[in-house]
Regions:
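Amide-forming acyltransferase catalytic core, primarily the GNAT-like/NAT-type
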Residues: 94, 118-200
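Short amphipathic alpha-helix that is part of the acyltransferase structural core
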Residues: 1-31, 124, 133-162, 199, ...
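Conserved acetyl-CoA-binding loop-helix of GNAT-fold acetyltransferases
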Residues: 72, 78-91, 115, 211-224, ...
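A short helix-loop-beta-strand connector motif used in the catalytic cores of GNAT acetyltransferases and
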Residues: 28, 34-54, 66, 123, ...
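Active-site/acyl-donor-binding loops of N-acyltransferases
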Residues: 116-135, 232-279
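Conserved GNAT acetyl-CoA-binding A-motif
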Residues: 93-105, 226-237
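Flexible loop/N-cap segments at domain edges
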Residues: 188-194, 198-234
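Conserved beta-strand in the GNAT
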Residues: 45, 51-59, 66-71, 186-195, ...
């Protein structure tokens, strides 16, 4: 089988969206436009001869990289296409100076990624509330543009990579919401949420592990602004925030396993993912 891999172009977006949504990912062209704005040439199209059969995405954060979407047409699976795309993305990230690559794997794909050198870390629950009830809580300070550098440094200390390009794209978008808590000019935790007309995704959140009270206050502040929406978030299965989300009406849709190729990058903290695609 003759594979060709090239960067995903705008003319490929219709195929990419159609293929991605065979996985019930509810993606749109805007998702690939957003990925391209963050990581030009980080989205890939795989062709078998002249036929497009697969896509993959990845993003670099300095020494940390993240592998995101991987989809192969059903009739082209188990023929090496998936391995070819993952290997191509790994090489791309290595050339960008990435030392550690993370991803979130569905349980059935853990053996596949293990064969490619990834090692399982911990499991994360994908939570969903289809109609969030109103929550009353004390509002917290919104993250301002002048706070961004401090937020990026705080985030990097725990995540391990510099997510400035991602964080500023979320935090500075007026449609989204965010807040942080500081003490003596030191950030203790922050959260951001991407908000759509009828849905929202809470994350990223990073908070010092010894301050679950701060993390709870951050989440409640964001939840208070999302009433009646479909709300999603992804948490470690042993998260200090699990009880809060379950009591707010969230339930687990499915779980994934975080895996790393290279040294595990994250430090102990209270954590919500930004997305399954970007870490």
């Amino acid at each position: 089988m003759m594979f060709e891999i090239k960067p995903l172009c705008k003319s490929d977006y219709d195929f990419a969206v159609e293929l991605a949504n065979t996985m019930d990912w509810h993606m749109a062209a805007e998702d690939f436009i957003f990925m391209d704005s963050l990581e030009p040439e980080g989205c890939f199209l795989l062709r078998d001869d002249t036929n497009p059969v697969g896509i993959a995405t990845c993003i670099s954060y300095g020494k940390i990289g993240w592998f995101g979407n991987l989809v192969i047409r059903k009739e082209s699976r188990k023929k090496g296409a998936g391995s070819a795309l993952v290997s191509h993305a790994i090489n791309y990230l290595r050339q960008k100076g990435v030392e550690t690559i993370g991803l979130y794997a569905y349980p059935y794909l853990v053996p596949f990624y293990t064969k490619l050198g990834f090692r399982s870390n911990i499991n994360f629950s994908v939570l969903h509330n289809p109609n969030l009830s109103p929550i009353s809580t004390k509002p917290l300070p919104t993250i301002k543009k002048s706070d961004l550098l401090s937020i990026v440094r705080f985030d990097q200390a725990f995540f391990g990579g510099n997510r400035k390009k991602l964080l500023q794209s979320i935090i500075l978008d007026p449609n989204n919401t965010s807040c942080c808590i500081s003490q003596d000019d030191q950030i203790l935790g922050y959260v951001a949420a991407t908000v759509y007309e009828k849905a929202a995704w809470i994350g990223p959140l990073i908070c010092q592990s010894q301050r679950p009270d701060i993390a709870v206050a951050l989440v409640n502040s964001v939840l208070s602004k999302l009433a009646t929406k479909h709300v999603y978030t992804v948490i470690p299965q042993d998260s200090a925030l699990a009880e809060l989300f379950f009591s707010a009406g969230f339930s687990e849709d499915f779980f994934v396993t975080r895996m790393f190729l290279g040294q595990t990058s994250t430090k102990n903290c209270i954590y919500l993912t930004e997305s399954l695609e970007r870490g």
